[in-house]
From Swiss-Prot:
A zinc finger (C2H2-type) spans 18-42, 83-107, 260-284. SUPFAM superfamilies: beta-beta-alpha zinc fingers (SSF57667). One of its GO terms (biological process) is ribosomal large subunit biogenesis. Residues 383-395 have a biased composition (Basic residues). This is Cytoplasmic 60S subunit biogenesis factor REI1 homolog. Belongs to the REI1 family. Residues 323-339 have a biased composition (Basic and acidic residues). Gene3D superfamilies: Classic Zinc Finger. Associates with nascent pre-60S particles that have not yet entered the translating pool, and is released from mature 60S subunits. InterPro entries: Matrin/U1-like-C_Znf_C2H2, ZN622/Rei1/Reh1_Znf-C2H2, Znf622/Rei1/Reh1, Znf_C2H2_jaz, Znf_C2H2_sf, Znf_C2H2_type. Pre-60S-associated factor involved in the cytoplasmic maturation of the 60S subunit. Involved in the dissociation and recycling of other late pre-60S factors before newly synthesized large ribosomal subunits enter translation.
Length: 537
């Protein structure tokens, strides 16, 4: 009887039991598999697998590494490019820009001009002499130092050792290859032999004929000052006391040309052109003369002795000040008080009030004191023709206009109205709220004159026989009736006919009043009512 084990075929042991499903390769032992897991090829295939891309073989990966090395070397060569055009004195750090410059018309014209110029008469321009280079380009035939080779090898190793979790790029920008130590020492020796001659600026001489704003040259200092005053608007303070105009102009010249400082605000710039542009843009053309320091700065060019009192400037203090080089601009002098006889009055040192200082009038009576040399103005008011009571003629006409017999002067009757010669009255603005009222039924001067005439006629008719005017106020037209006979009399209103006539008259009166009111309202809408302030009250 055959057993099961005997019937089975012997199992074959695989030669490469360890595999990598990502790269689709197999290995004989685990050591090779673990080494493959740490290689750049496997890491690159892992990245492609994450991106859903198929894996690549080791040959394709090697080609990609060589291409990356070539690109890195080209970038390093491009970054280290530096060439200088000797004709144009310009340095270029890009090969394309250098080629474009060589093919430009400007470079060719300068090269042709340099070829025609004799070699012994070549003189550098000011601009070319001031140009400098940041570094000398590396020579093609120089021996490259071993440190540069090590740096490039480190870059290549970094590509191999790159991992997925690395955040920074393993490629590091290499520096330009440095020449060997022997070549560097030769270059240093040549630079030491070349003498460095820096031109020293010549000492500037102050000029009183040069304009500090536009560099205009004038024949004389006086014409220079006139030019700056008329053209630029410069103001010289205290010109009547100026004794040294030339010294003042030189002082301003040194301040601008030597110290590059603004005359007005004191701001400093890098050169003369910058400070002149600043003064022109800001209109800083005047010389400051407000504070004591500013006055002392230019005080040596002035002479104020003519403003001193006699003998004041001949004291010892002035002599001492002149020896020390100081300048006196004048001191405060005490005021002298002289009485009527011309004698000097000594003032009280402590400042107490005297009898002459205090007023001899009461404070309450000060408003009634007339002006000195004039009598009270109210006494002359009655003598004025406009307010005279001796003139019997009417003050105004019937229409309210001033009578021609009166002089036409604008006068005040009170504090709120001004009566003009034309007859109109101008009200005070404090009463404007009342003047703005639209009074439709305000009577005109003609209507008021008519009413006054009617009232005067009625008053004359009611006068008594003796000529006495009846009592003003509410008139009592009803007769006094005793209480015992009240109601016995018969009035006219008890008659129906009389009552009808009276009611009809009242209706007509109301009708006329309504129609008149409607007409007045229509007129008031079409044309503005006259201002009440124009009427004479």
């Amino acid at each position: 009887m055959a057993t099961i084990a005997g019937s089975r075929a012997p199992t074959e042991v695989p030669s490469h039991p360890y595999t990598c499903n990502t790269c689709q390769v197999a290995f004989r032992n685990s050591e090779l598999q673990r080494g493959h897991m740490r290689s750049d090829w496997h890491r690159y295939n892992l990245k492609r697998r994450v991106a859903s891309l198929p894996p690549i073989s080791s040959e394709v990966f090697t080609e990609k590494v060589l291409q990356a090395r070539a690109a890195t070397t080209a970038q390093a060569d491009k970054a280290g490019f530096e060439k200088t055009c000797e004709v144009c004195q310009k340095t270029y750090y890009s090969e394309n820009s250098f080629r474009n410059h060589l093919s430009s018309t400007k470079h060719k014209s300068k090269a042709a001009a340099a070829a025609r110029r004799p070699a012994n008469n070549k003189v550098d321009d000011d601009v070319s002499s001031m140009s400098f280079s940041l570094g000398e380009p590396a020579r093609a035939d120089s021996v490259v130092d071993s440190e540069a080779e090590e740096e490039f090898s480190e870059v290549v190793e970094g590509i191999k050792n790159a991992s997925i979790h690395d955040t920074a790029s393993p490629i590091k920008r290499p520096s330009a290859p440095q020449p060997a130590v022997e070549e560097q020492s030769k270059t240093d020796a040549q630079m030491e032999e070349t003498p460095t001659t820096t031109p020293k600026p010549e000492a500037l001489t102050p000029s009183a004929t040069t304009c500090v704003f536009c560099n205009y040259e004038s024949p004389t200092p006086q014409l220079n000052a006139s030019h700056m005053e008329r053209i630029h608007g410069m103001f010289i303070p205290e010109k009547q006391y100026l004794v040294d105009l030339e010294g003042l102009l030189k002082h301003l010249w040194e301040k601008v040309f030597r110290y590059n400082e603004c005359l007005t605000c004191g701001k400093m710039k890098v050169n003369v052109f910058a400070i002149q542009t600043h003064m022109r843009d800001k209109s800083h053309y005047h010389i400051p003369y407000t504070t004591e320091e500013e006055q002392l700065e230019i005080g040596e060019f002035y002479d104020f002795r003519s403003t001193y009192s006699d003998g004041d400037w001949e004291t010892e203090e002035e002599d001492k000040g002149e020896e020390d080089g100081g300048v006196r601009l004048g001191a405060k002098r005490e005021s002298k008080v002289v009485d009527e006889n011309g004698d000097e009055v000594m003032e009280d040192e402590e400042g107490w009030e005297t009898d002459s200082d205090a007023s001899s009038l009461d404070t309450d009576d000060l408003h009634a004191v007339p002006a000195e040399g004039h009598y009270h103005q109210y006494e002359r008011l009655g003598k004025h023709p406009h307010h005279s009571r001796e003139n019997k003629k009417a003050h105004r006409e019937a229409d309210g206009i001033h009578a021609p017999s009166k002089r036409t002067h604008a006068v005040y009757y009170d504090e709120y109205e001004l009566h003009l010669p034309s007859g109109k009255s101008v009200g005070h603005r404090s009463l404007a709220r009342y003047y703005r009222q639209n009074l439709y039924h305000y009577p005109t001067p003609e209507e008021r004159a008519e009413r006054l005439a009617i009232e005067a006629a009625e008053r004359e008719n009611r006068m008594d026989v003796d000529g006495e005017e009846p009592e003003r106020g509410r008139t009592r037209t009803r007769a006094l009736v005793p209480r015992d006979i009240k109601g016995l009399g018969v009035t006219t209103m008890s008659d129906p006919r009389v009552r009808g006539i009276v009611q009809k008259g009242k209706k007509e009166e109301w009708k006329n009043r309504d129609s008149k009111w409607w007409m007045h309202s229509q007129v008031a809408i079409k044309e503005k009512a006259k201002h009440p302030s124009t009427y004479l009250r």
